[in-house]
Amino acid sequence: MKGSYKSRWVIVIVVVIAAIAAFWFWQGRNDSRSAAPGATKQAQQSPAGGRRGMRSGPLAPVQAATAVEQAVPRYLTGLGTITAANTVTVRSRVDGQLMALHFQEGQQVKAGDLLAEIDPSQFKVALAQALGQLAKDKATLANARRDLARYQQLVKTNLVSRQELDAQQALVSETEGTIKADEASVASAQLQLDWSRITAPVDGRVGLKQVDVGNQISSGDTTGIVVITQTHPIDLVFTLPESDIATVVQAQKAGKPLVVEAWDRTNSKKLSEGTLLSLDNQIDATTGTIKVKARFNNQDDALFPNQFVNARMLVDTEQNAVVIPTAALQMGNEGHFVWVLNSENKVSKHLVTPGIQDSQRVVIRAGISAGDRVVTDGIDRLTEGAKVEVVEAQSATTSEEKATSREYAKKGARS
């Protein structure tokens, strides 16, 4: 019984497998028949279709720009640091207790403005003593002069000897010298008193105070009371390669001030504009550069001491220069070249001689003329004599608008 039961299951399995195999065989024959006419038709059409594809294949899309003629400024650039025109550490010239500060931190002050006061009591006393001594010696001098006048009369009658007259004359001269010393002492005491009132030596901005009211200060303090930086005007010190020195000197000989621009770290924003002040008198042998100083009015306080900026100095303007976008300029084994478009939108390679250039544009001194069209994008797909399709650059805004329009269209189709 068990053997017959197993035999029946084996027969069932074999029948199922055979049925599946027959189904797949039949399905494959139908697919082959349906595909054969289409393949034959495609084979019949392929020679002509291939030739048409070769004749009318899609043109390589490129972007182009026209070479223009314009005046191009020539700049020398360098990295620099803003420095104050003057930096002064305000220190006391006398010793004493700091009684008052008359400025706000960060305040702009003028030369002569009162900044601080030191206790003047001791200096007033010293001045009074000097004045008293001067008055005393003046009285002594007046008496000595009267005695001298009497001696001069008495010597004529031999009532006073010539020696006594000479002694009196010496006393008068000595007292006159004492008076001069007393006057100097008075002036010194007055000066000490004046110095107890500390004033700004230059115009500028005061920094943070270095000492508080009530502290004892002296003329030997190195930190001082406050530091003043003169920022109106303010200077920029930057470096240029030694190869640019001749260009700067030649531009200076033209007699016009050289304009220097200060730009931020990213070179995206112009901070201020000034003029060249001077060149250093020697080249740094280590770096092969020379220091250059420019001065800025800085009334808007756009520049700040110790600020790092990019300097651009205008040294010349090239008139009637042929200019193209920098993206069009390429470099090959033969040198610099550009792809030029003719009236039929066919490209040809032109060797060129570049001049002044930056990230946006380049001057072409030889190789093309104003009005020539040059390829600026799609250059990697070009070959000599190839015909191309000139397309306009698509802005990011336009791309977003088109994408949005397609999205709305899809939503409309779904709804």
UniProtKB/Swiss-Prot annotation:
Signal peptide: 1-21
Stretches with biased composition (Basic and acidic residues): 399-415
Induction context: The mdtABC operon is transcriptionally activated by BaeR.
Entries under Pfam families matching the protein: HlyD_D23
Principal subcellular localization: membrane
Keyword terms, alphabetized: Cell inner membrane, Cell membrane, Membrane, Signal, Transport
Membrane-topology annotation of the record: Peripheral membrane protein
Summary of the function given for this chain in its UniProt record: The MdtABC tripartite complex confers resistance against novobiocin and deoxycholate.
Complex formation: Part of a tripartite efflux system composed of MdtA, MdtB and MdtC.
Protein name: Multidrug resistance protein MdtA
Provenance organism: Escherichia coli (strain SMS-3-5 / SECEC)
